[in-house]
């Protein structure tokens, strides 16, 4: 535990000293990685799912507050969901509204958590997030971690069920799509287990 506290102090001092140089690079890298992963995994709208567009958007994000990358990423996801299915897009929009309410209410200064958590899951290194946030952020950063986890499992579930969700637009099919999309959140026991483990890990490290 002492070693973790010493590491936390060293990282905080280093970042504070070189903040003006490190921050734009981090913003660009995180945004670009997020946009490329979105394109790779759920790039259903081909017009916006190209590397040049991802690069341009990431450059814009490097001069914006981190919340700008969160907003742009949300728009890209909604457009991709719309290209897949209107019903899924509506469910995603409701999810984002709820997440933004939770995020702005409890953890408005932890935008990186929302972006980096799905990225780390995509790179198969999810436990970097609770450990890193426990070392570098405040305890309330768990809310941005929760938002990131929920977002990852929702998008991963959509990807796994894309054949069903992109079916013909009939009345029964539309209802089925909504049920499938909602089930990625409400019926996902794995997500709830991961949420509990990650939050407990963050609290222990903190």
Label each region the model flagged.
Residues 130-206:
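Generic multipass alpha-helical transmembrane bundles of integral membrane proteins
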Residues 31, 35, 113, 125-129, ...:
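Alpha-helical transmembrane segments of polytopic integral membrane proteins
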Residues 1-18:
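Short, Lys/Arg-rich, polar N-terminal cytosolic tail immediately upstream
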Residues 42-52, 80-94, 187-195:
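Structural signature of hydrophobic alpha-helical transmembrane segments
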Residues 59, 72-148:
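Membrane-interface helix-loop-helix junctions at boundaries between adjacent transmembrane segments
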Residues 22-25, 119, 188-195:
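Hydrophobic alpha-helical transmembrane segments of multi-pass membrane proteins
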Residues 20-74, 81:
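Hydrophobic transmembrane alpha-helices
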């Amino acid at each position: 535990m002492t070693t973790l506290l010493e590491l936390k102090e060293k990282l905080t001092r280093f970042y504070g000293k070189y903040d003006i140089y490190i921050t734009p690079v981090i913003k660009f890298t995180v945004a670009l990685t997020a946009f490329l992963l979105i394109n790779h995994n759920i790039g259903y709208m081909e017009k916006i799912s190209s590397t040049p567009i991802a690069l341009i958007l990431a450059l814009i994000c490097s001069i914006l507050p981190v919340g700008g990358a969160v907003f742009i990423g949300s728009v890209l996801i909604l457009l991709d969901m719309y290209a897949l299915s209107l019903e899924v897009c509506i469910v995603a929009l409701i999810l984002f509204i709820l997440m933004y309410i939770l995020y702005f209410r409890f953890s408005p200064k932890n935008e990186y958590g929302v972006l980096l958590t799905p990225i780390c899951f995509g790179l198969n290194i999810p436990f970097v997030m609770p450990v890193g946030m426990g070392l570098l952020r405040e305890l309330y950063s768990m809310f941005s971690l929760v938002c990131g986890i929920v977002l990852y499992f929702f998008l991963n579930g959509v990807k796994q069920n894309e054949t069903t969700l992109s079916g013909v637009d009939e009345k029964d099919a539309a209802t089925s799509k909504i049920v499938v999309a909602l089930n990625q959140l409400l019926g996902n026991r794995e997500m709830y287990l991961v949420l509990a483990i990650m939050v407990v890990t963050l609290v222990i490290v903190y």
